[in-house]
Amino acid sequence: MPAKFIFVTGGVTSSLGKGITAASLGRLLKSRGLKVAIQKFDPYINIDPGTMSPYQHGEVFVTDDGAETDLDLGHYERFIDISLTKASNVTAGKVYWSVITKERRGDFLGGTVQVIPHITNEIKARLLRVAEESDPDVVITEIGGTVGDIESLPFLEAIRQMKSDIGRDRVLYIHVTLVPYLRAAGEAKTKPTQHSVKELRSIGIQPDIIVCRTERPFSREMEEKIALFCDIDPDAVIQAWDADSIYEVPLMMQEEGLDSIVVERLKLNCGPAQMDDWRAMVAKLKNITRHLEIALVGKYVTLPDAYLSVVESLRHAGMYHNVQVDIRWIYSADLERGGLEQLQDVAGILVPGGFGDRGVEGKIIAARYAREHGIPFLGICLGMQLAVVEFARHVCGLEAANSSEFNPETPHPVIDLLPEQKEIEDKGGTMRLGLYPCRLQPGTRAHQAYGEEIIYERHRHRYEFNNNYRAELTARGMVISGTSPDDRLVEIIELADHPWFVACQFHPEFKSRPNRPHPLFRDFIGAACRRAGGGAG
């Protein structure tokens, strides 16, 4: 049976939760036995978010095949429990680049290249490519931005055309909008939703379902009012009120009947949703009473979305151990000016990835504090590199040790540029990206965590442990517990005489799931629980 297509658009304002809505629907449809593919279309002109500031975009999520993508793909993977590909994130930049390349090659035979049909055809081709690659029952596509944005218009026009291209019975439109609650008036207001749907209909898209983000539930009468003005069935007005945890949203959507309406409208052949495991997970999350505080020492701590997958991975591990992980956000540059008291009473310290030299010395201070005080430590990517620098300086006596990224003239470049990176000048899409194998050493904490010899993890880096210093550092107590299969690249280091000090070059946070925490996060939180007292859950 040909794939059915579901398009999720947003109105009134950004950050309403289109991604969570799409991910929740994907989870519900998968639980019905359907094969689900999902993708995000972003209307910005960047080719990908790889070179964008985290302050503007949040986290860059990396797929198995090395795509640098929008953070919503992390939600998709965690909720639906699938691994996505480069085809799952399409930007306006990629679309225009492809069309311009074809024009330069002469593919359009001298014709005038226009937004319609050339840009819209390219968008539709990328929509259909996902269906061709994975042969799903359903393809869910989230359109980034807000209806009314100039940048979104070609994407909206493309999805409008889809209903005539492949048939109205294979297409369904979901519009996520805002129903604000005005405390002064003591009621919710539907006017923003009405205007947003009017804008959407003006470009030829009639939504089948409206998902209303709201602070609190509203009346059936208000649902009927929205249905009347927006020309949909009252049962297709779905309320999505504020939840304590994003993992409650699929259950909320199921209760509101979202998946049932989708199945009915698209005539999908499937069974009822099997959400018992998810429901049990959420119930466990709600019943947690024990708290555990972890210090996250980073550069972008004023914008937690910059570390979204790390935060979610800590929560997954917390659920496993029956604790709520509370994060103490510490701006790494503050530690360079003192402020060590911020680290004194935490159960664990995590130093995540990052770029640039601002705050680097503060991260080194955090790694040293964890090493000297026996505090469980997890370093990720740059966090591993700086743990190596700290060890070289303060244990091996290489006082000027550094990464050549931050000091090209250092006499001891314990972290250096990967050989294959030395001639590369472009910044975008040129790092060591995606899934690579790693061989673990038996008897190490890493091997104990994974329980297997060969693992596969996602990477995003240019710099690597300098093997010229491997013998010197291991002689002083550093353990190389994971390497590339050819032993050329150091992937994981740990300390032998420490309760739990592990750092990895890859990004374990991208493979954690709410019902299956990543082994390193799981054991890190387990060690933190033991330090806090009471043992791991």
Curated annotation (Swiss-Prot):
Pfam (any one): GATase
EC identifiers of the protein: 6.3.4.2
Gene Ontology molecular-function annotations: ATP binding; CTP synthase activity; glutaminase activity; identical protein binding; metal ion binding
Span of domain Glutamine amidotransferase type-1: 293-534
Positions that bind L-glutamine: 55, 354, 382-385, 405, 462
Catalytic activity: UTP + L-glutamine + ATP + H2O = CTP + L-glutamate + ADP + phosphate + 2 H(+); L-glutamine + H2O = L-glutamate + NH4(+); UTP + NH4(+) + ATP = CTP + ADP + phosphate + 2 H(+)
Pathway: Pyrimidine metabolism; CTP biosynthesis via de novo pathway; CTP from UDP: step 2/2
Active site annotation, chain numbering: 381 (nucleophile), 507, 509
GO BP term, pick one: 'de novo' CTP biosynthetic process
Top-level division of the source organism's lineage: Bacteria
Regulation affecting activity: Allosterically activated by GTP, when glutamine is the substrate; GTP has no effect on the reaction when ammonia is the substrate. The allosteric effector GTP functions by stabilizing the protein conformation that binds the tetrahedral intermediate(s) formed during glutamine hydrolysis. Inhibited by the product CTP, via allosteric rather than competitive inhibition.
Entry binding sites for UTP: 14, 189-194, 225
Main function: Catalyzes the ATP-dependent amination of UTP to CTP with either L-glutamine or ammonia as the source of nitrogen. Regulates intracellular CTP levels through interactions with the four ribonucleotide triphosphates.
Protein name as catalogued: CTP synthase
Organism in which the protein naturally occurs: Moorella thermoacetica (strain ATCC 39073 / JCM 9320)
GN (gene name): pyrG
